[in-house]
A protein has these predicted regions:
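Glycine-rich ThDP/TPP pyrophosphate-binding loop and its adjacent helix/strand module
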Residues: 2-142, 327-339
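Intrinsically disordered, low-complexity segments enriched in small/flexible residues
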Residues: 1, 105, 192-196
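Thiamine diphosphate
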Residues: 137-144, 148-339
Length: 339
């Protein structure tokens, strides 16, 4: 429940619905509790209506402890390739304990009495926790066999695809899925015709487009600011529901989701960039921190970095943003000038 209260969740949901990302399935653990209270005090909107209006398929699981129900919902979600799906799984926090349904169990601990009460409810009172070797091996073997079967199936399909691909396409695809892309910027021709007077945004745009022509997995987008930041890959098309071959992502005014999605792209083998005005980097700060934590190769491009180059007033004029970015561990911050 708490996750869906966050602004980033709505940004991402709106973005996914707009692109009709039919392979996206979200399982929502709806126990109607957060750390401080039950959601009847803080979160009374209709989540199903919100997601439906954003273009999502909404499915329900009445009993969250039913693996069968959950499995049926996932199977149904997979069949819909034209809409992302959210599965609302109704659960009871602290089920079986004395604090069942009480938000205090959210971050609290079970007492010994609670523990014993739950065991009585499950019919295992008096039995110590144990995991016998034989059933443990059976579970392990099932997982291994399932994975082996799926891998063999994938290899078979991929071998058929490879027959239709040239050697460069195979190399690019395999370097992407195995996250082993290598490139040498020293071999890139940066013979750029700089104007005598041009903004760094214009210079950066020229560099980005040269890199894009040399590094095929360099993709990214703006939070509705590309016409100003100029962080756009010319001639590379925009990604849309009808065309996922583009290299430009139109995030709309969704800075938080822009940063988070860029992290996901980096984890999937791409070299993404994310851009907006410097003052709005604050909206991306949680995602930037995660990039730094995980050593992800995300390039954040922030323009309009001075109070002197924005005609929109104080809301668009950065003051403390540069210092806060420089204070972040494992984040390289460059501010070129007078080149």
């Amino acid at each position: 429940d708490g996750d869906l209260m966050e602004g980033i969740s709505y940004e991402a949901a709106s973005f996914a619905g707009n692109l009709k990302l039919g392979k996206l399935i979200v399982l929502y653990d709806s126990n109607k509790s957060t750390r401080d209270s039950n959601t009847n005090k803080t979160f009374t909107e209709s989540v199903s209506s919100r997601f439906a209006s954003a273009g999502w398929q909404v499915l329900y699981v009445k009993k969250g402890t039913s693996i069968t129900e959950i499995n049926k919902a996932i199977i149904k979600a997979k069949k819909n390739q034209n809409m992302p799906s959210i599965i609302i799984v109704n659960t009871v926090i602290g089920e079986g304990s004395k604090l069942e349904g009480n938000s205090s169990i959210y971050s609290g601990e079970l007492t010994k009495d609670d523990y014993e009460q739950i065991k009585r409810g499950l019919g295992v009172e008096g039995l110590p926790f144990t995991l016998l070797k034989e059933p443990a091996e059976n579970i392990r073997n099932q997982v291994v066999n399932r994975g082996t079967s799926l891998n063999d199936e994938w290899d078979k399909i991929y071998s058929e695809y490879k027959k239709e691909m040239n050697s460069n396409e195979v190399l690019e695809f395999e370097s992407l899925i195995y996250n082993s892309i290598n490139f040498d910027l020293t071999k890139v021709d940066f013979d750029i015709n700089y104007e005598q007077k041009e903004t760094l945004r214009e210079s950066n745009s020229k560099v980005m487009n040269i890199i894009s022509n040399s590094i095929w997995n360099f993709v990214g987008g703006n939070a509705d600011t590309s016409s100003s930041t100029l962080a756009y890959l010319n001639g590379k098309e925009d990604i849309s529901y009808s065309n996922f071959k583009g290299k430009n992502i139109l995030y709309g005014v969704r800075e938080n989701a822009c940063g988070a999605i860029s992290n996901g792209l980096a984890l999937s083998g791409f070299l993404p960039f994310a851009s907006t005005f410097m003052a709005f980097s604050d909206y991306m700060k949680p995602s930037i921190r995660m990039s730094a934590f995980m050593n992800l190769p995300v390039t954040y491009i922030f323009t309009h970095d001075s109070i002197t180059n924005s005609f929109d007033g104080p809301t668009h004029q950065p003051v403390e943003q540069l210092a806060s970015l420089r204070a972040m561990p494992n984040l390289y911050v460059y501010r070129p000038a007078d080149i």
